[in-house]
Amino acid sequence: MRTCKNGNSYEAANKLFTVRHDGTRRGGTDEKGSHWHGEQVMNYLMDRENSKDTDPFLIYYGFSHPHDVRDGKPELLKKYGAVNHLDPNILPPANPRQPPLPVNWLPEHPFDHGHTTVRDEVGVKGVWKKRDERTIRNEMGREFACSENIDIQIGRVLRKLEEMGELDHTYVIYTADHGMAIGRHGLQGKQNLYEHTWRIPFIVKGPG
């Protein structure tokens, strides 16, 4: 089975999955955010359990966060001192609980790298063209909130696999397609060749 955001997957590959769930948008609620993806996987595992299905399985768990728009859940945003900022005419509130600025933060990129006007650099809700400290720290808090929600949803699935007796013989692979600048080098998006963009996690856990 697989989950993904509608429009962000490859149809030829989708046809190989017998169970497919597409989220229609990213959001900061359980109905539209990472919890929704987790719920689809949990339902799939419970269906396997109830039907006593012992065939091998593949789950592609395709979260759409922390890609923008990084609308986090209220309780996680509060933990990281962030808000889902909506007004491009004012700065988000400062909060000491927000993550610090990245060590390589810059207020602007020092040269035109060829992608300074793409949507990722000028049109992301909550940041737009701003690179000031308050905006970037708030956006980092939103990213942390969205990333922690992914941790929570993966934890739900791992506990369910353990409860079913499946975890010890299941390979779990955690990776991503790209990173994101969020103020590093004065950039916001992914259209660049800095390490913060092309370096991604790759974690494998399983038997053997």
Predicted regions and their residues:
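Active-site-proximal cap/lid insertion segments
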Residues: 24-31, 35, 44-208
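Active-site segment of extracytoplasmic enzymes that catalyze sulfate/phosphate-ester chemistry
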Residues: 1-2, 6, 11-25
